[in-house]
């Protein structure tokens, strides 16, 4: 790295930022939105570590958390580093909202999506409960126009929502491959056709059931056409992401099985498998252990105490968000499930 670049910020390697971060990419990235006022990386790491320990009522853990971060054993998710221990944003990476089949719920979930994205999280949006185009509308002689116009609403919401100067909001729309609107929905990211039905700012996740896979194996023509379209789109664009709902629910934790809870959708990255419904929106509380440093930490207590760290992150989210309008579903889910990842 150009030594002058760090020095121009008044940073000394090994003192103000770690030696493993002595690259131009590190310095430019962390100084672009992650630091508050005149913070240096060391100050930011201490801020995060102390905040997590405070939320746990375990101040003695702050130095341990700081050591993990400084050593690059524990890698912080973007919202954790940017927002933990501050009065801005929330320390949560992403959320999942499930939309009920009513205009009221569609509108309320749009408000929820806007607020979640604004405060630092990507949002997975479940569309499976919505009726397909042509379905009758209650108390009306009309029929619904399907899921795509509502995707357009969420597309515009994400385009209009930013997360300060850290990153723009992001969202994915989840739909079952068996849904009646699949054929139009699978094309919404293509810049062609009716501009009012294009959703160029959304990601897509397609949900696959065991029932569909059995029909596919049995040679059902419509199932094969749909599966072929998914594969063609993935080859061309890398999307839609795929979630095998049957496999997920077979591996549900005991608490889910005991209470009859099923997973119907996922987040943008398709790695979160938590329960959602109209009144529960999942919370994705993340950080990472650095496998490149595995030989350094494999015989330490980093895994054990990193779990405590994440619990402190989740507690900060709950305490910050429980009095914020639009976060009721997420707080309810966090308090009940206490999911960490």
What are these regions (language model features)?
Residues 1-341:
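Extended catalytic cores of very large enzyme megasubunits
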């Amino acid at each position: 790295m150009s030594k002058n670049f760090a020095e121009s910020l008044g940073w000394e390697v090994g003192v103000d930022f770690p030696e493993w971060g002595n690259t131009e990419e590190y310095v430019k990235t962390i100084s672009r939105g992650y630091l508050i006022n005149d913070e240096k990386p060391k100050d930011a790491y201490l801020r995060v570590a102390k905040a997590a320990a405070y939320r746990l009522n375990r101040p003695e853990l702050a130095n341990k958390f700081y050591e993990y971060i400084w050593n690059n054993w524990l890698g912080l998710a973007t919202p954790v580093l940017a927002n933990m221990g501050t009065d801005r944003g929330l320390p949560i990476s992403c959320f999942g909202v499930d939309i009920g089949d009513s205009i009221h719920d569609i509108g309320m979930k749009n408000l929820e999506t806007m607020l979640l994205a604004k405060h630092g999280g990507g949002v997975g949006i479940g569309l499976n409960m919505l009726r397909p185009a042509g379905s009758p509308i209650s108390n009306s002689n009309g029929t619904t126009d399907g899921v795509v116009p509502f995707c357009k609403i969420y597309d515009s919401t994400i385009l209009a929502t930013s997360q300060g100067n850290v990153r723009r909001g992001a969202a994915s729309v989840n739909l079952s491959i068996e849904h009646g609107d699949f054929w139009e929905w699978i094309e919404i990211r293509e810049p062609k056709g009716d501009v009012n039905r294009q959703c160029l700012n959304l990601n897509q996740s397609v949900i696959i059931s065991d029932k569909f896979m059995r029909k596919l194996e049995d040679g059902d023509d419509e199932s094969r056409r749909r599966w072929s379209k998914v594969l063609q789109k993935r080859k061309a664009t890398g999307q839609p992401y795929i979630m095998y709902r049957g496999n997920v629910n077979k591996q549900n934790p005991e608490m889910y099985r005991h209470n009859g809870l099923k997973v119907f959708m996922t987040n943008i990255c398709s790695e979160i498998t938590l329960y959602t419904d109209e009144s529960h929106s999942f919370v994705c509380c993340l950080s990472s252990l650095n496998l490149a440093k595995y030989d350094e930490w494999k015989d330490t207590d980093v895994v054990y105490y990193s779990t405590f760290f994440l619990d402190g992150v989740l507690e900060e989210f709950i305490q910050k968000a429980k009095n914020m309008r639009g976060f009721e579903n997420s707080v309810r889910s966090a308090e009940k499930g206490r999911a960490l990842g």
